[in-house]
């Protein structure tokens, strides 16, 4: 039996996010970086894992809600120091939606993505979009 760990899931999510954005982070955004980032993606597993069994053979599977958060730096102008960079957010969101479904053969799949927060200010110079998807094991 293949044991699937949270680290396996996060690593796969991170690899897929890197196809869309050069800078990615696991679980949470950093408090500080060496350079000002214009865009980045955070991949996380913020919810509990649901273990399920089925039948007399005790076949099992996991269901987890996974989260991809896209952060785009605000445009700073004299008239609006927190202007939302809508073209950049749209580009990244559309590109990320294109990587689904994410399938690791004989292990798990991540599918049914949905945007749950379309664009909101984080109060720290970025707007973010949250995309949730369903991860289900395939063993």
Residue ranges with predicted function:
Residues 29:
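Short catalytic/ligand-gating loop segments at beta-alpha or beta-beta junctions
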Residues 36-47:
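A short, hydrophobic beta-strand-centered structural micro-motif
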Residues 1-25, 33, 47-139:
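Charged, amphipathic alpha-helical segments and their flanking helix caps
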